[in-house]
Each structure stands twice: as structure tokens, then as C-alpha cells.
Amino acid sequence: MNELDGIKQFTTVVADSGDIESIRHYHPQDATTNPSLLLKAAGLSQYEHLIDDAIAWGKKNGKTQEQQVVAACDKLAVNFGAEILKIVPGRVSTEVDARLSFDKEKSIEKARHLVDLYQQQGVEKSRILIKLASTWEGIRAAEELEKEGINCNLTLLFSFAQARACAEAGVFLISPFVGRIYDWYQARKPMDPYVVEEDPGVKSVRNIYDYYKQHHYETIVMGASFRRTEQILALTGCDRLTIAPNLLKELQEKVSPVVRKLIPPSQTFPRPAPMSEAEFRWEHNQYAMAVEKLSEGIRLFAVDQRKLEDLLAAKL
């Protein structure tokens, strides 16, 4: 049995890609997209019809060019998501504009709009996850959306404080990042030789997984942002893992026994009182890595969102 099939015995595998053909090849349960992945996919000629449709929608649904570009971007994200849902049996994650990461109300408004666009294409909201950055405002937006039956995927998660606040808000799913945590520590104190058990990104997800299970939180833990297959194999047993096509390929090509590494702890504890905003900000602020990586992640997604807007604006 190849490693990918081995992992699928214990974990729900999700494709981290906007490339529909790549997703088709690996038979994942779900798929995740973000502005960077959409930008990459939008540059491929086979998806030109999705862009043309989004452009036509933008022209029809915006008065100014700025409004047309925003409308086209939203429609493009939904077009890709709807196509992906023809392939995966589960859900697709679609991201709210990263520039709204510190605005609860506008994040809620954008999320509702994206869900509405999906529903206009005949996609039920039960098949959509709305991705929001794990800022205090993003978590509060998700808390309200969950009450409306709009499930959320809280992304750019680097600290335990973020994970705890998400669970306390009752969000559907979190995406704790492994590779970007590894990158931060590797740049400062390189691990040579590499020991997966000491990988700070792997340890972060394990800690969150154990805490959630010990306190009976129902929020799904989906490890994300991997740099190497060892990180993925070390988290086998995690609720879900979202994996890029290049790493799915490596796992599919290697035949090796896969052992479950994450198992819910037998000991359980009562849940603590929910964190206040002040506690959240203080705890998150204790970790330079988490502060830097959350800020950087938001900036990078915003840059790619602007590039996507520029690409569409040139076609309007």
C-alpha cells in the first residue's frame, strides 16, 4: 500500500490546491483554496472559461470598475469552488479577502455573499467552508456565522491561543500551519539533521489535537502548510490533513507501512472559562513566531488578492 492510501486509513485527506486536474488525480475528500492558489490556477489556460464567466458577472453586477473587479473576484473564487465540488464528495474552502481580517462585520458580510453566490449555482452551504484568518475579529465573525449554519475554516493559525479561542467560539474547523512554523524556526536555528519529532510545527498540531480531544471540543483539526512528507506522516491520525499536489504525489509514489501517530488521549478535563479578548491578545503576543507569521500571512494573501484583481481588471 502506498503512503497516501495508508494515511487515508486514519485521516481525512484534503487537497490544498485550486488546480482542478490535480485534485481529480488524488481523490481527496475535500479541497482548500486561497487567493495564492487561485492566482496560480487563474494563469492556466484550461480555466479561461471560469475567468470569462467571472468577468461577465463583474460587468453585470458592478457600476464602477472597482465594484466590477470585486464582483468578478468573488465570482471567480466561487466558480473554482463549484468546479472542485464536482470532483470531491465533501467540502471546498473559500477564503474571505484577507484585507478584512480585522473587520468582523465586513468579514461576515463577505462570507454571506460568497455563500449566496454558491447557492445561486446550486451548491448547498453544507458543502462550503468559509476561510477566515484566525485574528480575534475573524474568530468572532466565525462564531456568528456558525450560528447561521455557515461553517468556517479558521486559517493562518500559529499559536495555542488562536486554537483555544477558535474551539471556545465553536468554529467548525481550524487549519494550524506546520510548514510556516517550521520555516520560522529553521531560519533562526536550523535543525540538522532533521528530526520530525522535534519539528516545532508538528509539535504545535499535536498539542492542539490533544487539548481538543481532552476537553471534548468538536472543532475539527486540519493540519496544513507542509514542507515535507515526514511532517504529514508524523501527524497521521489527525482529523484532517490538507496537502499540496506535489506532496500528494510523493506519498502516492512511496510504498511503505503507515502507523497512526495521533490518538485521542484517554484522560479528559473540564473546559476552562472562555478567554477574554485581552487574554487572547496577551497569550498570542507571547510568541514572536505566531505574531510575525500571522501578520505576514495576511499581508501575503492580500498581495495575491490584489494581483488577482489586477489580472481581472485588465480583462474588464
Swiss-Prot record:
Keywords carried by this UniProt record: Cytoplasm, Pentose shunt, Schiff base, Transferase
Domain of life: Bacteria
Active-site residues, record numbering mapped to chain: K131 (schiff-base intermediate with substrate)
Biological process annotations from GO: carbohydrate metabolic process; pentose-phosphate shunt
InterPro entries (alphabetical): Aldolase_TIM (IPR013785), TAL/FSA (IPR001585), Transaldolase_1 (IPR004730), Transaldolase_AS (IPR018225)
Classification via SUPFAM superfamilies: Aldolase
This protein's pathway: Carbohydrate degradation; pentose phosphate pathway; D-glyceraldehyde 3-phosphate and beta-D-fructose 6-phosphate from D-ribose 5-phosphate and D-xylulose 5-phosphate (non-oxidative stage): step 2/3
MF (Gene Ontology): transaldolase activity
Pfam families named in the record: TAL_FSA (PF00923)
GO cellular component: cytosol
Location within or outside the cell: Cytoplasm
EC number: 2.2.1.2
Coarse class of the protein's main subcellular location: cytoplasm
Catalyzed reaction equations: D-sedoheptulose 7-phosphate + D-glyceraldehyde 3-phosphate = D-erythrose 4-phosphate + beta-D-fructose 6-phosphate
Claim: Transferase is one of the keywords in the record: yes
Keyword Cytoplasm: yes
PANTHER family reported in the protein's UniProt record: TRANSALDOLASE, TRANSALDOLASE A
Family: Belongs to the transaldolase family. Type 1 subfamily.
Family matches, as NCBIfam families: PRK12346.1, talAB
Assembly information from the UniProt record: Homodimer.
Role description: Transaldolase is important for the balance of metabolites in the pentose-phosphate pathway.
Official protein name in the record: Transaldolase 2
Species whose genome carries this gene: Shigella sonnei (strain Ss046)
Top-level taxonomy: Bacteria, Pseudomonadati, Pseudomonadota, Gammaproteobacteria, Enterobacterales
